[in-house]
Amino acid sequence: MSQRVLTTESGAPVADNQNSASAGIGGPLLIQDQHLIEKLARFNRERIPERVVHARGSGAYGHFEVTDDVSGFTHADFLNTVGKRTEVFLRFSTVADSLGGADAVRDPRGFALKFYTEEGNYDLVGNNTPVFFIKDPIKFPDFIHSQKRDPFTGRQEPDNVFDFWAHSPEATHQITWLMGDRGIPASYRHMDGFGSHTYQWTNARGESFFVKYHFKTDQGIRCLTADEAAKLAGEDPTSHQTDLVQAIERGVYPSWTLHVQLMPVAEAANYRFNPFDVTKVWPHADYPLKRVGRLVLDRNPDNVFAEVEQAAFSPNNFVPGIGPSPDKMLQGRLFAYADAHRYRLGVNHTQLAVNAPKAVPGGAANYGRDGLMAANPQGRYAKNYEPNSYDGPAETGTPLAAPLAVSGHTGTHEAPLHTKDDHFVQAGALYRLMSEDEKQRLVANLAGGLSQVSRNDVVEKNLAHFHAADPEYGKRVEEAVRALRED
């Protein structure tokens, strides 16, 4: 096999890739050295803005196979036939730290799944917890600012973290998840994934159901203690990435079983708490899990930058039979994610291979044109306006999901209150489900952070939330904080 020739970006052969052109042996370098200038300029532009959240991530390809009939609940084509397989790409991530952060840290994990269906790409952009810290997107920038590095100290500050939580009692449920054992998964393979939000399914008869997604790991749950994680983060900062890549390369393919909870739309208005509140779960006793299928990851990306860093997910990427719910946090994300990708990757990010729909030959069929890095050569007979007389793409007239009934006046509103719509009952229930060992680790983790908070009023507000969740919970955290402060 003949040796390939090294070329410039324009395709010209490179004569010397070891020495820059200069004026004599020891003279200054020449600006006419096209290869040097091009190589340095290209290097300066290798990085793009990192994600403002979920920057540190890993990903893999695989497939989703339907194992159980759910055609009575959704007419989504990729879910309509038992045995049907759909190609997928799954990106895991941490949330708060930067691209260079460690994997083994206490942080929620992103679980962003792209289904390359025959009706377009469907993105399910979830986490490894079923709930979240807040329920209104207007608080999201402030929440993330409080969790990321302080602009003065350049480090994550317990004062900021717990101060925001002190003013956000709705975060108590997710805090209990995060500070418990599942706050540090041993690997991406050994954690569950959740859609977290409530979505809408519509069947072929036009009947609608609200739905929650649960991906249960087939590898079993494995977690790290704070000490184990600190040691691993120092020894192998990319531990989760290493584990995922090596497992797939060995042929040990990680898998998850998908279950859903389904609520008839008519039941939502009278349910005992707001079913669209992402800080709460639906009790399985009310809406039991129904198995749908199996997710398997079996192929690593060839290029992490091209396929993981440039992967773009948006909760607004639906397919026929699936749509959004009135969940406020979801509604905010429907805009924010796609807008973040337009900033980070450009308006044509859907033309990148990892993001391009496979359902339409040649890419998406619409009248969007041009923009930075446009690679889709639509011209000549492809008109850039609609309607037209040239057989261009036309609308179907069929909405992806059933419409939702709304009423009331415009304005800013508190989330609707139901009989048991408080911030603490489910946090207390989660605490009481834990074993004694799990409770001890939860209390120790919380106390370790709270003991570093400088303001007593912030500590007291947080303790009040844990007392409201469960008196024993609050008392144990309070005593542990006091003991650490006395030391």
UniProtKB/Swiss-Prot annotation:
CC cofactor: heme
Reaction(s) catalysed (UniProt annotation): 2 H2O2 = O2 + 2 H2O
Segments for region (Disordered): 1-20
UniProt-annotated binding residues for heme: 337
GO biological process: hydrogen peroxide catabolic process; response to hydrogen peroxide
SUPFAM superfamilies xref list: Heme-dependent catalase-like (SSF56634)
Keyword rRNA-binding: no
GO molecular function: catalase activity; heme binding; metal ion binding
Pfam families reported for this sequence: Catalase, Catalase-rel
Function: Decomposes hydrogen peroxide into water and oxygen; serves to protect cells from the toxic effects of hydrogen peroxide.
Protein name per its UniProtKB record: Catalase
Organism, scientific name: Streptomyces coelicolor (strain ATCC BAA-471 / A3(2) / M145)
Annotated gene: katA
